[in-house]
Protein backbone atom coordinates (compact mmCIF):
# COMPACT_ATOMS: atom_id res chain seq x y z
CA UNK A 1 0.00 0.00 0.00
CA UNK A 2 1.09 3.56 -0.68
CA UNK A 3 0.96 4.59 2.97
CA UNK A 4 3.39 1.79 3.81
CA UNK A 5 6.17 3.37 1.79
CA UNK A 6 8.90 4.94 3.93
CA UNK A 7 8.61 8.67 3.90
CA UNK A 8 11.50 10.82 2.86
CA UNK A 9 13.40 12.66 5.58
CA UNK A 10 12.04 15.96 6.78
CA UNK A 11 13.98 18.96 5.47
CA UNK A 12 15.00 21.83 7.71
CA UNK A 13 12.21 24.32 8.45
CA UNK A 14 12.26 27.61 6.61
CA UNK A 15 13.84 26.18 3.47
CA UNK A 16 12.17 25.77 0.02
CA UNK A 17 12.58 22.01 0.39
CA UNK A 18 10.59 22.11 3.62
CA UNK A 19 7.67 23.94 1.95
CA UNK A 20 7.58 21.40 -0.89
CA UNK A 21 7.71 18.55 1.60
CA UNK A 22 4.87 20.11 3.63
CA UNK A 23 2.56 20.41 0.56
CA UNK A 24 3.30 16.83 -0.37
CA UNK A 25 2.44 15.61 3.12
CA UNK A 26 -0.87 17.53 3.16
CA UNK A 27 -1.88 16.04 -0.21
CA UNK A 28 -1.05 12.55 0.94
CA UNK A 29 -3.05 13.08 4.13
CA UNK A 30 -6.09 14.20 2.08
CA UNK A 31 -5.93 11.11 -0.12
CA UNK A 32 -5.55 8.90 2.89
CA UNK A 33 -8.69 10.35 4.53
CA UNK A 34 -10.66 9.77 1.34
CA UNK A 35 -9.60 6.15 1.24
CA UNK A 36 -10.47 5.72 4.90
CA UNK A 37 -14.06 7.02 4.30
CA UNK A 38 -14.51 4.62 1.42
CA UNK A 39 -13.27 1.74 3.48
CA UNK A 40 -15.66 2.63 6.32
CA UNK A 41 -18.67 2.62 3.94
CA UNK A 42 -17.67 -0.79 2.65
CA UNK A 43 -17.25 -2.04 6.17
CA UNK A 44 -20.74 -0.79 7.26
CA UNK A 45 -22.42 -2.46 4.26
CA UNK A 46 -20.70 -5.76 4.80
CA UNK A 47 -22.05 -8.60 6.82
CA UNK A 48 -21.05 -9.17 10.42
CA UNK A 49 -18.74 -11.94 9.30
CA UNK A 50 -16.68 -9.39 7.47
CA UNK A 51 -16.58 -7.04 10.48
CA UNK A 52 -13.96 -9.18 12.12
CA UNK A 53 -11.92 -9.15 8.94
CA UNK A 54 -12.31 -5.38 8.73
CA UNK A 55 -11.19 -5.00 12.31
CA UNK A 56 -8.26 -7.28 11.63
CA UNK A 57 -7.37 -5.27 8.56
CA UNK A 58 -7.59 -2.07 10.60
CA UNK A 59 -5.31 -3.47 13.24
CA UNK A 60 -2.85 -4.54 10.58
CA UNK A 61 -3.00 -1.13 8.96
CA UNK A 62 -2.45 0.50 12.32
CA UNK A 63 0.63 -1.60 12.95
CA UNK A 64 1.99 -0.88 9.50
CA UNK A 65 1.34 2.80 10.02
CA UNK A 66 3.24 2.73 13.31
CA UNK A 67 6.06 0.86 11.63
CA UNK A 68 6.20 3.45 8.86
CA UNK A 69 6.19 6.30 11.37
CA UNK A 70 8.91 4.57 13.37
CA UNK A 71 10.98 4.12 10.22
CA UNK A 72 10.41 7.75 9.35
CA UNK A 73 11.62 8.86 12.79
CA UNK A 74 14.68 6.63 12.56
CA UNK A 75 15.46 7.94 9.09
CA UNK A 76 15.04 11.54 10.23
CA UNK A 77 17.20 10.90 13.28
CA UNK A 78 19.92 9.27 11.16
CA UNK A 79 19.81 12.15 8.69
CA UNK A 80 19.99 14.67 11.51
CA UNK A 81 22.94 12.84 13.08
CA UNK A 82 24.64 12.65 9.69
CA UNK A 83 24.16 16.39 9.19
CA UNK A 84 25.46 17.04 12.70
CA UNK A 85 28.57 14.92 12.05
CA UNK A 86 29.14 16.65 8.72
CA UNK A 87 28.72 20.07 10.34
CA UNK A 88 31.15 19.11 13.11
CA UNK A 89 33.66 17.89 10.52
CA UNK A 90 33.30 21.10 8.53
CA UNK A 91 33.68 23.10 11.73
CA UNK A 92 36.80 21.15 12.68
CA UNK A 93 38.26 21.58 9.19
CA UNK A 94 37.57 25.30 9.34
CA UNK A 95 39.07 25.48 12.84
CA UNK A 96 42.16 23.58 11.67
CA UNK A 97 42.56 25.93 8.72
CA UNK A 98 42.20 28.91 11.04
CA UNK A 99 44.76 27.43 13.46
CA UNK A 100 47.23 26.90 10.63
CA UNK A 101 46.74 30.48 9.48
CA UNK A 102 47.07 31.77 13.04
CA UNK A 103 50.22 29.73 13.68
CA UNK A 104 51.70 30.86 10.37
CA UNK A 105 50.93 34.48 11.19
CA UNK A 106 52.41 34.06 14.68
CA UNK A 107 55.51 32.44 13.20
CA UNK A 108 55.91 35.29 10.72
CA UNK A 109 55.41 37.80 13.54
CA UNK A 110 58.07 36.01 15.63
CA UNK A 111 60.56 35.97 12.76
CA UNK A 112 59.84 39.62 12.07
CA UNK A 113 60.21 40.41 15.76
CA UNK A 114 63.52 38.54 15.95
CA UNK A 115 64.86 40.48 12.98
CA UNK A 116 63.81 43.78 14.53
CA UNK A 117 65.42 42.80 17.84
CA UNK A 118 68.69 41.90 16.12
CA UNK A 119 68.67 45.14 14.18
CA UNK A 120 67.94 47.13 17.33
CA UNK A 121 70.86 45.46 19.12
CA UNK A 122 73.19 46.33 16.23
CA UNK A 123 71.99 49.92 16.24
CA UNK A 124 72.44 50.21 20.00
CA UNK A 125 76.07 49.27 19.42
CA UNK A 126 76.40 51.96 16.72
CA UNK A 127 76.49 49.51 13.81
CA UNK A 128 73.79 51.36 11.88
CA UNK A 129 74.75 50.18 8.39
CA UNK A 130 74.56 46.54 9.40
CA UNK A 131 71.22 47.10 11.16
CA UNK A 132 69.78 48.83 8.09
CA UNK A 133 71.03 46.13 5.72
CA UNK A 134 69.57 43.41 7.94
CA UNK A 135 66.11 44.94 7.79
CA UNK A 136 66.15 45.90 4.11
CA UNK A 137 67.19 42.38 3.12
CA UNK A 138 64.35 40.82 5.11
CA UNK A 139 61.54 39.41 2.88
CA UNK A 140 58.92 41.22 4.99
CA UNK A 141 60.55 44.64 4.76
CA UNK A 142 58.29 45.89 1.95
CA UNK A 143 55.12 45.17 3.94
CA UNK A 144 56.40 45.89 7.44
CA UNK A 145 55.82 49.42 8.67
CA UNK A 146 57.78 48.64 11.84
CA UNK A 147 60.88 47.70 9.85
CA UNK A 148 60.60 50.75 7.63
CA UNK A 149 60.19 53.01 10.66
CA UNK A 150 63.23 51.41 12.28
CA UNK A 151 65.35 51.99 9.16
CA UNK A 152 64.28 55.61 9.09
CA UNK A 153 65.23 56.03 12.76
CA UNK A 154 68.64 54.39 12.25
CA UNK A 155 69.37 56.55 9.21
CA UNK A 156 68.47 59.68 11.16
CA UNK A 157 70.70 58.69 14.09
CA UNK A 158 73.56 57.75 11.78
CA UNK A 159 73.35 61.20 10.19
CA UNK A 160 74.14 62.75 13.58
CA UNK A 161 77.35 60.73 14.01
CA UNK A 162 80.77 62.27 13.57
CA UNK A 163 84.24 60.77 13.27
CA UNK A 164 86.01 60.96 16.61
CA UNK A 165 89.58 62.38 16.56
CA UNK A 166 91.69 59.25 16.96
CA UNK A 167 94.45 61.12 18.79
CA UNK A 168 91.90 61.86 21.52
CA UNK A 169 90.95 58.29 22.42
CA UNK A 170 91.98 57.44 25.96
CA UNK A 171 93.06 53.96 27.12
CA UNK A 172 92.48 52.75 30.70
CA UNK A 173 93.65 49.53 32.32
CA UNK A 174 93.44 47.40 35.44
CA UNK A 175 95.19 44.45 37.03
CA UNK A 176 93.30 41.51 38.55
CA UNK A 177 90.46 42.80 40.71
CA UNK A 178 90.33 42.26 44.46
CA UNK A 179 87.27 40.28 45.54
CA UNK A 180 87.98 40.03 49.29
CA UNK A 181 89.72 43.13 50.69
CA UNK A 182 90.20 41.49 54.10
CA UNK A 183 92.58 39.00 52.51
CA UNK A 184 94.33 41.33 50.09
CA UNK A 185 94.88 43.96 52.77
CA UNK A 186 95.79 41.67 55.65
CA UNK A 187 99.09 43.28 56.58
CA UNK A 188 101.45 40.76 54.97
CA UNK A 189 104.36 41.62 52.68
CA UNK A 190 102.12 41.65 49.58
CA UNK A 191 99.63 44.20 50.90
CA UNK A 192 101.58 47.26 49.74
CA UNK A 193 101.81 46.01 46.16
CA UNK A 194 98.11 45.14 46.05
CA UNK A 195 97.22 48.54 47.50
CA UNK A 196 99.26 50.36 44.87
CA UNK A 197 98.41 48.57 41.63
CA UNK A 198 95.17 46.69 42.20
CA UNK A 199 91.54 47.80 42.13
CA UNK A 200 88.67 46.34 44.14
CA UNK A 201 85.52 44.98 42.52
CA UNK A 202 83.50 47.69 44.24
CA UNK A 203 85.76 50.40 42.81
CA UNK A 204 85.68 48.83 39.36
CA UNK A 205 81.88 48.65 39.28
CA UNK A 206 81.55 52.28 40.35
CA UNK A 207 84.06 53.41 37.73
CA UNK A 208 82.32 51.43 34.99
CA UNK A 209 78.89 52.80 35.92
CA UNK A 210 80.17 56.38 36.12
CA UNK A 211 81.95 56.17 32.77
CA UNK A 212 78.81 54.75 31.19
CA UNK A 213 76.71 57.57 32.59
CA UNK A 214 79.22 60.05 31.15
CA UNK A 215 78.77 58.55 27.70
CA UNK A 216 81.96 56.49 27.40
CA UNK A 217 81.91 53.65 24.88
CA UNK A 218 84.41 50.77 24.62
CA UNK A 219 86.18 50.58 21.27
CA UNK A 220 88.85 48.30 19.87
CA UNK A 221 92.27 49.64 18.97
CA UNK A 222 91.66 47.81 15.71
CA UNK A 223 88.85 50.28 15.04
CA UNK A 224 91.43 53.03 15.47
CA UNK A 225 94.00 51.59 13.07
CA UNK A 226 93.79 49.01 10.29
CA UNK A 227 96.52 46.62 9.15
CA UNK A 228 96.80 45.17 5.65
CA UNK A 229 98.35 41.84 4.69
CA UNK A 230 101.78 43.46 4.41
CA UNK A 231 101.70 44.97 7.88
CA UNK A 232 101.03 48.51 6.69
CA UNK A 233 98.99 50.68 9.06
CA UNK A 234 96.24 53.13 8.10
CA UNK A 235 93.87 55.17 10.22
CA UNK A 236 90.52 53.68 11.09
CA UNK A 237 87.29 55.50 11.85
CA UNK A 238 85.05 55.63 14.90
CA UNK A 239 81.62 57.14 14.26
CA UNK A 240 79.60 58.09 17.32
CA UNK A 241 76.50 60.21 17.94
CA UNK A 242 76.67 63.34 20.10
CA UNK A 243 77.33 62.75 23.79
CA UNK A 244 79.42 59.61 23.30
CA UNK A 245 83.18 59.31 23.95
CA UNK A 246 85.34 56.34 22.90
CA UNK A 247 87.88 54.63 25.14
CA UNK A 248 90.01 51.48 25.05
CA UNK A 249 89.98 49.03 27.97
CA UNK A 250 92.64 46.50 28.93
CA UNK A 251 93.70 44.29 31.83
CA UNK A 252 97.18 43.01 32.63
CA UNK A 253 98.38 39.63 33.94
CA UNK A 254 95.15 37.68 33.50
CA UNK A 255 96.96 34.50 34.45
CA UNK A 256 96.04 34.23 38.14
CA UNK A 257 99.55 33.73 39.43
CA UNK A 258 100.39 31.25 42.17
CA UNK A 259 101.57 33.97 44.54
CA UNK A 260 98.03 35.41 44.64
CA UNK A 261 96.42 32.21 45.98
CA UNK A 262 94.52 32.83 49.18
CA UNK A 263 94.77 36.61 48.91
CA UNK A 264 91.18 37.34 47.91
CA UNK A 265 91.43 37.03 44.12
CA UNK A 266 89.67 34.77 41.63
CA UNK A 267 91.69 31.72 40.63
CA UNK A 268 90.70 31.19 37.00
CA UNK A 269 88.23 31.90 34.21
CA UNK A 270 85.72 29.17 33.39
CA UNK A 271 82.58 28.62 31.33
CA UNK A 272 79.26 28.11 33.08
CA UNK A 273 76.45 25.82 31.92
CA UNK A 274 75.28 28.44 29.44
CA UNK A 275 78.76 28.89 27.97
CA UNK A 276 79.24 32.30 29.59
CA UNK A 277 82.64 33.28 30.96
CA UNK A 278 82.78 33.34 34.76
CA UNK A 279 85.38 33.08 37.51
CA UNK A 280 86.21 30.43 40.05
CA UNK A 281 86.97 31.55 43.57
CA UNK A 282 88.23 29.31 46.39
CA UNK A 283 86.40 29.93 49.65
CA UNK A 284 87.93 29.63 53.13
CA UNK A 285 86.60 26.08 53.55
CA UNK A 286 88.14 25.00 50.26
CA UNK A 287 84.87 24.96 48.33
CA UNK A 288 84.81 26.61 44.92
CA UNK A 289 82.33 29.33 43.98
CA UNK A 290 81.58 30.35 40.40
CA UNK A 291 80.63 33.95 39.68
CA UNK A 292 81.62 37.35 38.31
CA UNK A 293 84.78 38.12 40.29
CA UNK A 294 87.01 39.86 37.75
CA UNK A 295 86.93 42.27 34.83
CA UNK A 296 85.99 39.94 31.97
CA UNK A 297 82.72 38.55 33.36
CA UNK A 298 81.84 41.87 35.03
CA UNK A 299 82.12 43.70 31.71
CA UNK A 300 80.21 40.94 29.91
CA UNK A 301 77.33 41.26 32.37
CA UNK A 302 77.41 45.05 32.11
CA UNK A 303 77.21 44.97 28.31
CA UNK A 304 74.32 42.51 28.51
CA UNK A 305 72.43 45.18 30.44
CA UNK A 306 73.88 48.14 28.51
CA UNK A 307 74.64 47.17 24.88
CA UNK A 308 75.46 50.80 24.05
CA UNK A 309 78.56 50.59 26.26
CA UNK A 310 80.22 48.61 23.45
CA UNK A 311 81.11 49.94 20.00
CA UNK A 312 80.14 47.29 17.45
CA UNK A 313 80.68 44.46 19.91
CA UNK A 314 84.08 45.56 21.21
CA UNK A 315 85.27 44.44 24.64
CA UNK A 316 88.71 44.93 26.15
CA UNK A 317 92.22 43.60 25.65
CA UNK A 318 93.49 40.85 27.95
CA UNK A 319 97.29 40.94 28.34
CA UNK A 320 98.93 37.59 29.11
CA UNK A 321 102.29 36.38 30.29
CA UNK A 322 102.97 32.66 30.05
CA UNK A 323 105.30 31.47 32.79
CA UNK A 324 102.41 30.46 35.11
CA UNK A 325 100.10 29.62 32.24
CA UNK A 326 97.10 31.68 31.13
CA UNK A 327 93.61 32.42 32.43
CA UNK A 328 94.30 30.35 35.56
CA UNK A 329 95.29 27.19 33.67
CA UNK A 330 98.82 25.82 34.01
CA UNK A 331 99.56 25.68 30.30
CA UNK A 332 103.31 26.26 30.20
CA UNK A 333 105.51 23.35 29.17
CA UNK A 334 107.67 23.78 32.28
CA UNK A 335 104.89 22.18 34.36
CA UNK A 336 105.44 19.01 32.36
CA UNK A 337 109.20 19.10 31.73
CA UNK A 338 109.96 20.21 35.32
CA UNK A 339 113.42 21.71 34.74
CA UNK A 340 115.90 21.91 37.60
CA UNK A 341 115.29 25.63 38.08
CA UNK A 342 111.50 25.25 38.43
CA UNK A 343 110.38 27.85 40.97
CA UNK A 344 109.00 26.90 44.36
CA UNK A 345 105.42 27.96 43.60
CA UNK A 346 105.24 25.63 40.61
CA UNK A 347 106.80 22.77 42.57
CA UNK A 348 104.25 23.16 45.36
CA UNK A 349 101.34 23.39 42.94
CA UNK A 350 102.43 20.22 41.13
CA UNK A 351 102.73 18.39 44.45
CA UNK A 352 99.17 19.42 45.26
CA UNK A 353 97.95 18.32 41.82
CA UNK A 354 99.46 14.88 41.13
CA UNK A 355 96.88 14.28 38.37
CA UNK A 356 98.14 17.28 36.35
CA UNK A 357 97.81 16.96 32.58
CA UNK A 358 99.31 19.63 30.34
CA UNK A 359 97.05 18.58 27.49
CA UNK A 360 93.90 18.94 29.60
CA UNK A 361 94.99 22.34 30.93
CA UNK A 362 95.68 23.62 27.44
CA UNK A 363 92.41 22.25 26.08
CA UNK A 364 90.42 23.93 28.86
CA UNK A 365 92.27 27.23 28.46
CA UNK A 366 91.71 27.29 24.71
CA UNK A 367 88.01 26.65 25.18
CA UNK A 368 87.71 29.68 27.47
CA UNK A 369 89.85 31.82 25.15
CA UNK A 370 87.66 30.93 22.18
CA UNK A 371 84.53 31.89 24.13
CA UNK A 372 86.11 35.21 25.08
CA UNK A 373 87.03 36.03 21.51
CA UNK A 374 83.49 35.20 20.41
CA UNK A 375 82.29 37.90 22.82
CA UNK A 376 84.68 40.50 21.39
CA UNK A 377 87.66 40.18 23.73
CA UNK A 378 91.15 40.50 22.28
CA UNK A 379 94.43 39.09 23.56
CA UNK A 380 97.85 40.69 23.83
CA UNK A 381 101.33 39.58 24.76
CA UNK A 382 102.57 40.92 28.07
CA UNK A 383 105.81 39.07 27.28
CA UNK A 384 106.12 35.46 28.43
CA UNK A 385 108.22 36.24 31.50
CA UNK A 386 106.88 39.73 32.37
CA UNK A 387 110.02 41.34 30.97
CA UNK A 388 111.06 44.99 30.95
CA UNK A 389 111.58 45.35 27.21
CA UNK A 390 113.32 48.70 27.62
CA UNK A 391 116.09 47.12 29.70
CA UNK A 392 116.57 43.54 28.51
CA UNK A 393 118.86 42.64 25.64
CA UNK A 394 117.65 41.83 22.16
CA UNK A 395 118.68 38.21 22.73
CA UNK A 396 116.58 38.02 25.91
CA UNK A 397 113.63 39.57 24.08
CA UNK A 398 113.98 37.01 21.30
CA UNK A 399 114.12 34.08 23.73
CA UNK A 400 111.12 35.36 25.66
CA UNK A 401 109.07 35.94 22.51
CA UNK A 402 109.80 32.42 21.31
CA UNK A 403 108.43 31.01 24.58
CA UNK A 404 105.29 33.11 24.23
CA UNK A 405 104.70 31.98 20.67
CA UNK A 406 105.26 28.35 21.61
CA UNK A 407 103.21 28.20 24.81
CA UNK A 408 100.58 30.94 24.51
CA UNK A 409 99.88 31.80 20.87
CA UNK A 410 98.42 28.37 19.98
CA UNK A 411 95.86 28.76 22.78
CA UNK A 412 94.67 32.25 21.87
CA UNK A 413 94.96 32.02 18.09
CA UNK A 414 97.97 34.35 17.96
CA UNK A 415 98.06 38.09 18.50
CA UNK A 416 99.61 41.19 16.94
CA UNK A 417 99.19 43.30 20.10
CA UNK A 418 101.90 43.71 22.73
CA UNK A 419 101.29 45.50 26.02
CA UNK A 420 104.57 46.12 27.76
CA UNK A 421 105.08 44.98 31.34
CA UNK A 422 106.14 47.44 34.05
CA UNK A 423 104.56 50.25 32.04
CA UNK A 424 107.76 50.58 30.03
CA UNK A 425 108.22 51.19 26.32
CA UNK A 426 110.62 50.11 23.62
CA UNK A 427 112.17 53.55 23.56
CA UNK A 428 111.67 57.06 24.84
CA UNK A 429 112.18 58.42 21.35
CA UNK A 430 109.43 60.17 19.45
CA UNK A 431 109.16 57.29 16.97
CA UNK A 432 109.95 53.59 17.08
CA UNK A 433 113.13 52.35 15.45
CA UNK A 434 116.03 50.03 16.24
CA UNK A 435 116.66 46.31 16.52
CA UNK A 436 114.02 45.51 19.15
CA UNK A 437 111.25 47.20 17.19
CA UNK A 438 112.33 45.55 13.94
CA UNK A 439 112.39 42.17 15.66
CA UNK A 440 108.91 42.55 17.17
CA UNK A 441 107.54 43.91 13.90
CA UNK A 442 109.04 40.91 12.12
CA UNK A 443 107.28 38.64 14.61
CA UNK A 444 103.95 40.13 13.56
CA UNK A 445 103.33 42.74 16.26
CA UNK A 446 101.54 45.84 14.95
CA UNK A 447 99.97 47.39 18.06
CA UNK A 448 102.16 48.59 20.97
CA UNK A 449 100.98 49.93 24.34
CA UNK A 450 102.90 51.36 27.29
CA UNK A 451 101.74 53.24 30.41
CA UNK A 452 101.33 57.00 30.27
CA UNK A 453 99.61 59.19 32.85
CA UNK A 454 98.47 61.72 30.25
CA UNK A 455 94.88 61.72 29.06
CA UNK A 456 95.80 60.83 25.49
CA UNK A 457 98.83 59.43 23.75
CA UNK A 458 98.26 57.96 20.31
CA UNK A 459 100.66 57.44 17.41
CA UNK A 460 99.58 56.01 14.08
CA UNK A 461 102.52 55.44 11.80
CA UNK A 462 102.94 53.51 8.56
CA UNK A 463 104.29 50.43 10.36
CA UNK A 464 102.83 50.55 13.86
CA UNK A 465 100.11 51.80 16.19
CA UNK A 466 101.23 53.09 19.59
CA UNK A 467 99.07 54.13 22.53
CA UNK A 468 99.65 55.11 26.15
CA UNK A 469 97.49 53.69 28.93
CA UNK A 470 96.20 55.11 32.21
CA UNK A 471 96.27 52.99 35.37
CA UNK A 472 93.05 53.09 37.40
CA UNK A 473 94.41 51.74 40.67
CA UNK A 474 94.94 52.63 44.31
CA UNK A 475 98.07 54.65 43.66
CA UNK A 476 96.58 56.83 40.94
CA UNK A 477 93.27 57.40 42.77
CA UNK A 478 95.05 58.34 46.00
CA UNK A 479 97.89 60.53 44.70
CA UNK A 480 96.56 61.93 41.40
CA UNK A 481 92.75 62.07 41.52
CA UNK A 482 92.80 65.20 39.35
CA UNK A 483 94.20 63.15 36.47
CA UNK A 484 91.05 61.02 36.50
CA UNK A 485 88.40 63.74 36.63
CA UNK A 486 87.44 63.26 32.98
CA UNK A 487 86.51 59.67 33.87
CA UNK A 488 85.14 59.69 37.43
CA UNK A 489 85.40 61.29 40.87
CA UNK A 490 88.11 59.34 42.70
CA UNK A 491 86.82 60.31 46.14
CA UNK A 492 83.41 58.81 45.37
CA UNK A 493 84.98 55.61 44.03
CA UNK A 494 87.82 55.00 46.51
CA UNK A 495 87.10 51.85 48.57
CA UNK A 496 86.90 52.55 52.31
CA UNK A 497 88.44 49.12 52.94
CA UNK A 498 91.67 50.23 51.27
CA UNK A 499 94.42 51.08 53.81
CA UNK A 500 95.69 54.66 53.72
CA UNK A 501 98.00 56.19 53.02
CA UNK A 502 98.61 54.12 49.91
CA UNK A 503 102.35 53.34 49.87
CA UNK A 504 104.32 55.54 47.44
CA UNK A 505 106.12 53.95 44.52
CA UNK A 506 109.84 53.20 44.76
Predicted regions, residues:
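Metal-dependent polysaccharide deacetylase catalytic core of the NodB/CE4 family, i.e.
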Residues: 167-187, 231-232, 240-247, 254-426
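Membrane/wall-proximal cationic-aromatic binding patches
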Residues: 218-232
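N-terminal targeting leaders characterized by basic, low-complexity, disordered sequences
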Residues: 1-32, 38
